[in-house]
């Protein structure tokens, strides 16, 4: 059987190249060769924090644009040679959770997240995609692969944070954390019609992109509690929506304190470090302050990717601003991942161009 090479989590705290048998293509599936890849902080959590437990020789990665190398006999909408956007989340669309409107949670909590979780990820010379007609999107001719790869997870997750926050025309919004996902939440808030947008962060390159994406105010968490700064800036009114895209467990307390009655706190941040999320009882009205909490996992699937791609085509978003480091050659995946782990101050997102 044919072999292929991929960059893998060999075990907790160890990564390396592995050789495996080429995955089989099911009747409704596809085999993809990557054109553009991007490491994610989730890959770092997986390997060096044990976020999903131990894995042996599991190929990493879930952000990809590629070219169709093989299709199953029942695939109708794609052919060999098509360039496609691959969502990070590839649900089982016939599952009960998908039919209830929660495709990211198919077969169980976070079950739509298959790449580098339940099966090998996209950092391989080839990789498998289930239900190709529902989980692939054609790459528009005028969109570059390295631009589109920012849609797989970053924009899909960040904009979900804004969608879940119930932002209305003129809403005042706070986005806590302006790494790549938080920056996409800023862009999402602006596209949904927010008025004033507070962006909480300090790194100059991220602050610059936050302003480009629509932030009206920058809050420096080093200058004091962010809830106090935002309450002062809003004459003690607070905000209509809070999107948590960074920070720590204390961030939740600050989010509740800055939230108005009727607001939504929308979380897109991976929670680590403690089993219990603390909420300030009094500020939350003893649990009765009409401050809701919304959570979600990156939306996936074909329609999601097509709609995000249309935002690029018609000038609503500019994902290229997220890309600070470019690598050429598939073998540079390792360098890109280690850059993500080291997190230099000038980094937002790295991209690997595989050709």
Regions found by a protein language model. Name each.
Residues 23-37, 50-99, 120, 140-142:
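Glycine-rich beta-strand-centered segment in the early N-terminal region that forms part
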């Amino acid at each position: 059987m044919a072999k292929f090479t991929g960059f893998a989590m060999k075990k907790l705290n160890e990564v390396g190249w592995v050789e495996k048998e080429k995955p089989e293509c099911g009747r409704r599936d596809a085999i993809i060769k990557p054109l553009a890849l991007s490491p994610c902080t989730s890959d770092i959590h997986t390997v060096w924090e044990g976020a999903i437990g131990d894995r042996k020789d599991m190929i990493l990665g879930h952000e990809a644009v590629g070219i169709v190398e093989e299709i199953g006999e029942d695939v109708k909408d794609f052919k060999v040679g098509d360039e496609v956007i691959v969502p990070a989340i590839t649900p089982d669309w016939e599952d009960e959770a998908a039919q209830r409107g929660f495709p990211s949670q198919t077969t169980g909590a976070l079950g739509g997240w298959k790449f580098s979780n339940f099966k090998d990820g996209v950092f391989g010379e080839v990789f498998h995609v289930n239900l190709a007609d529902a989980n692939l999107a054609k790459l528009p001719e005028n969109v570059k692969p390295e631009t589109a790869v920012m849609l797989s997870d970053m924009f899909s997750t960040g904009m979900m944070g804004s969608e879940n926050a119930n932002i209305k025309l003129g809403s005042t919004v706070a986005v806590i954390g302006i790494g790549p996902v938080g920056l996409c939440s800023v862009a999402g808030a602006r596209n949904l019609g927010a008025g004033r947008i507070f962006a909480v962060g300090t790194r100059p390159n991220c602050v610059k992109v936050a302003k480009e994406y629509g932030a009206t105010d920058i809050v420096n968490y080093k200058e004091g509690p962010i809830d106090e700064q935002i309450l002062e800036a809003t004459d003690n009114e607070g905000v209509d929506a809070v999107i948590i895209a960074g920070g720590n467990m204390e961030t939740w307390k600050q989010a509740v304190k800055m939230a108005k009655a009727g607001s939504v706190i929308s979380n897109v941040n991976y929670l680590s470090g403690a089993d219990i999320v603390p909420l300030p009882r009094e500020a939350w009205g003893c649990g009765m302050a009409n401050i809701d909490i919304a959570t979600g996992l990156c939306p996936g699937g074909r329609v999601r990717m097509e709609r995000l791609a249309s935002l690029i085509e018609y000038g609503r978003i500019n994902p290229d601003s997220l890309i600070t480091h470019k690598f050429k050659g598939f073998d540079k995946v390792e360098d890109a991942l280690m850059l993500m782990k080291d997190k230099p101050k000038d980094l937002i997102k790295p991209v690997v161009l595989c050709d």
